[in-house]
Amino acid sequence: MKTNPLPATPSVWGGSTVELPPTTRDTAGQGLLRRVLRPPISRRDGPVLPRGSGPRRAASTLWLLGLDGTDAPPGALTPNDDTEQALDKILRGTMRGGAALIGSPRHHLTRQVILTDLCQPNADRAGTLLLALRHPADLPHLAHQRAPPGRQTERLGEAWGQLMEATALGSGRAESGCTRAGLVSFNFLVAACAASYDARDAADAVRAHVTANYRGTRVGARLDRFSECLRAMVHTHVFPHEVMRFFGGLVSWVTQDELASVTAVCAGPQEAAHTGHPGRPRSAVILPACAFVDLDAELGLGGPGAAFLYLVLTYRQRRDQELCCVYVIKSQLPPRGLEPALERLFGRLRITNTIHGTEDMTPPAPNRNPDFPLAGLAANPQTPRCSAGQVTNPQFADRLYRWQPDLRGRPTARTCTYAAFAELGMMPEDSPRCLHRTERFGAVTVPVVILEGVVWCPGEWRACA
């Protein structure tokens, strides 16, 4: 009788499973196959651990958050480390991290010692904008370089000389070597340009504040002569934005006689710096209402969200009617999209400068190469020619026709410049707070705008033409 060998796989007999042991031959074959397929350097008994270390364990949630003790290894849980203790540790760590973040925001301070001719911090308040002014001795040289032919370049030097004669020390010329006023208060600049604003009553209030609260008997003369300096700068194309820059938001100051040491926030949150005044330890940005423009409200743009702040200077270049005006504009538009909005807002100035910006300039000589003679050169076979690849070779390029037009009296980008803007910073809140109110400066009431939560991040000037 022939019998079949027992199977090496599990069999089902009577509803139960019976696993038969493998034979010695099968075991020997599996060992040989395992030695062939697995290299000698492979791990045989789990992961290879360094000497003296235990097996790998899962990291706990507290250890991953950095809230567990430094001496407790990851995954080491105690019976008392229940859910309530875990939540308590997480909340305490979050509060410590939040307090450290809120208590020490990053901001940068700058300090300068100045004369109090164009900036008197005692009369202004913390949060006032300060602008740095280039050395006045450089301006006459810039006028000779940039003024169009026919313009009176000496007008700028004379205007600054008359302004320096009305300063506190009586002279501020470069040859005297005395201290000069290197900072200009935004309020003083607005007061000097008071005649240029549409809100004339609010601008006159700023001028009355500067005249009444700035120390000295010749404050009105300084305002008039500084205004003449601004008009002379526009006349000679040494535009004010080329000699002024943002210095910072005023925080604290120390004055003695006609000198002042001012401290300002030049970058970062304005309200992060302590003013040292017990009544007002923090300062918000304060601006004259006549010099503040909410561009989104004017043009019907935007909605809730963060906004940018820009410092804008506008110019009118008509003969004997030169004007300069300064604004702080709030808008959600980024710098690359602001110029079209300014063109719409100050379109009248742009048209005026384009039409009348060349007045008082020496006109070109009549019939002196007015147009490039392209048709005549193309029709004459004797005219020297060269290929595009030979233009850079002087042997061929020197024989070509030279067109030398007379550009005197012709419109340029500088004659059409009507504005310039620079980014000051931003208001990162979803709903930036701009408070319109009246503040009392001594005996004068001035309409102002208070901006809260301003973060300074100044940028470069961009001219609009």
UniProtKB/Swiss-Prot annotation:
Keyword Glycosyltransferase set for record: no
Location within or outside the cell: Virion; Host nucleus
Keywords for the protein's UniProt record, in alphabetical order: Capsid protein, Host nucleus, Virion
InterPro entries linked: Herpes_1
Molecular function (Gene Ontology), one example: DNA binding
Gene Ontology CC terms, in alphabetical order: host cell nucleus; viral capsid
The keyword Zinc is annotated on this UniProt entry: no
GO biological process: viral capsid assembly
The family this protein is said to belong to: Belongs to the herpesviridae TRX1 protein family.
Assembly: Interacts with TRX2, MCP and capsid vertex component 2/CVC2.
Function: Structural component of the T=16 icosahedral capsid. The capsid is composed of pentamers and hexamers of major capsid protein/MCP, which are linked together by heterotrimers called triplexes. These triplexes are formed by a single molecule of triplex protein 1/TRX1 and two copies of triplex protein 2/TRX2. Additionally, TRX1 is required for efficient transport of TRX2 to the nucleus, which is the site of capsid assembly.
Record protein name field: Triplex capsid protein 1
